[in-house]
Amino acid sequence: MPMRRRVLAAGVAGLFGAFATGRTAQAVENTENAEAAVPPVRLDLLNLVNLSHVNDPATTNVFPGDPAFTLETIATIPENGYYLQFVREGEHTGTHWGAPGHFNTGQPLADEMDPADLFLPAVKIDIRAKAARNADYAVTIDDLKAWERKHGRIPNDSMVILWTGWDAKWGTPAFPNLDADNRIHQPGFSIPAVKWLIDTGRLGRRGGTGTDTFSPDVGTDETYTVSQLVYQRHRISLEILANLRALPTTGAWVLAGGPIHRHGSGSTATIFGVLPPGVRA
C-alpha cells in the first residue's frame, strides 16, 4: 500500500479507535506516528446507514413559516435529452444541519465551517418512552447522567442525538403535532441539560445536538434558548433525522453533507451514520 494510503487508513483507524476507548479524535495528533500507533482499517469494511428522509411535496413537513417544498419538472428526456427538476425549499427543509450563524449573529455560517465540523462521533439517547407519554418532554441532566452510568461518558466534541420516535411520524400531521393555537408539541433538550453538556466539554468547540424532530428545543419553547446555546463556535445541530433505529447507541460517527450556500444558515443534507467494523445497532 502506498505510504499516503497507509497513513490515511491509519488516521481513520485512529479516529474510531480513539472514540471506542473513550478518547477524543484529538488524542491522535501526530500523523507521522499514527500508523505505528494503530493498525490500518479497511475503509471498505465501514458500514454506512442513511439517516435522511426523502423529500416529497406531498408529505414533507415544513416548520411553520418556512417556505413550502416544491418540485417542478423543467426538462424531460424525450423533449430535452435529459431529466431535470427545479427545487424550491428553505435551507432547513427536511433532514438538514444548521450552522452557528443560524441563531447567533457573528458566529460561523455554512461557508465558514470546516469539513471536520461535519464528521463527528455520535451517541444516541433513546427517550421514546418518555416522549410517548409527554410530547413536550425536556431531557434533563439526570437523564444524561443515567445514560452515562449505563453506556459510559459522552466523549468531548460529540454529536449527542435524541431518538424521540418522531422519525416514525414523518410525513403526517403527527410530526409537527400542532395544537389549536398552531404551537408545535415535540420533545427536546432542557436548557440546563445543554448547559451541562457545554460546561463539561461534551459539547466543545465542535460537536452538537441531533434529533428526529424539528429542533433541539422543546417545541413549545419559542425563545429557542437551547438552539442559541448549541449554535456557537463550530457546533452544529442535525435535525429531522431518519432511521435512528439503525444508529448504534455508541461507537458510530455521523457525516453530514449537502450544498454550501454563500452566507448559508445551514444546508439540506444527506446524513450518514458511519459504523466501524464490529459496531452494530
In which residue ranges do the predicted regions lie?
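Active-/binding-site microenvironments in catalytic and ligand-binding cores
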Residues: 2-3, 9-22, 28-281
